[in-house]
Amino acid sequence: MSRYRGPRLKKIRRLGALPGLTRKTPKSGSNLKKKFHSGKKEQYRIRLQEKQKLRFHYGLTERQLLRYVHIAGKAKRSTGQVLLQLLEMRLDNILFRLGMASTIPGARQLVNHRHILVNGRIVNIPSFRCKPRDIITTKDNQRSKGLVQNYIASSDPGKLPKHLTIDTLEYKGLVNKILDRKWVGLKINELLVVEYYSRQT
């Protein structure tokens, strides 16, 4: 299944706020159309909805998300928490959380077009996994800096998660550590996502 490129408002009406996909928020009462089913059908619908929220927020294909679930399942810690850590430490998401892009698709474009450096080297892979002490910067030219300047200027410093630091003058971000669960930027029940995939096998 390919990455979603359709109407974004349609998705947030159905799934609720997806800040990684769009800054728009659903009008009160317009999202999460409730269809009541009995027993197993209702439980399946809830698990599917949480999986879709995760997929669309981070801008993943079904295959990519499944691969992350498999990797997380091999860890000795909670599969759900490891899954969220893997997704949050992607380079495209780090750029988004730093405020260097307004959405994850926007951050992905910056990476694909070779505007972003990690520890002084160009990285053009959005799924690149960042680690503690990584330094994220733009290329040292006017065009690259101009692409992130307005986003950084308009971003709310109070929303910056504690595992990241941003130098707004140097257009430089720092990964301080692996994020804690409470800093995830999406309202999600990750256990239901893991449960969804465990029931597919």
UniProtKB/Swiss-Prot annotation:
Keyword terms of this UniProt record: Chloroplast, Plastid, Ribonucleoprotein, Ribosomal protein, RNA-binding, rRNA-binding
Compartments it resides in: Plastid, Chloroplast
HAMAP family in the record: Ribosomal_uS4_B
Region described as Disordered: 17-36
Major localisation: plastid
PROSITE patterns in alphabetical order: RIBOSOMAL_S4, S4
Name the record gives this protein: Small ribosomal subunit protein uS4c
Residues covered by the S4 RNA-binding domain: 89-157
Organism encoding this protein: Agrostis stolonifera (Creeping bentgrass)
Lineage: Eukaryota, Viridiplantae, Streptophyta, Embryophyta, Tracheophyta
Record function comment: One of the primary rRNA binding proteins, it binds directly to 16S rRNA where it nucleates assembly of the body of the 30S subunit. With S5 and S12 plays an important role in translational accuracy.
Family, per entry: Belongs to the universal ribosomal protein uS4 family.
Cellular component GO terms held in the UniProt record: chloroplast; small ribosomal subunit
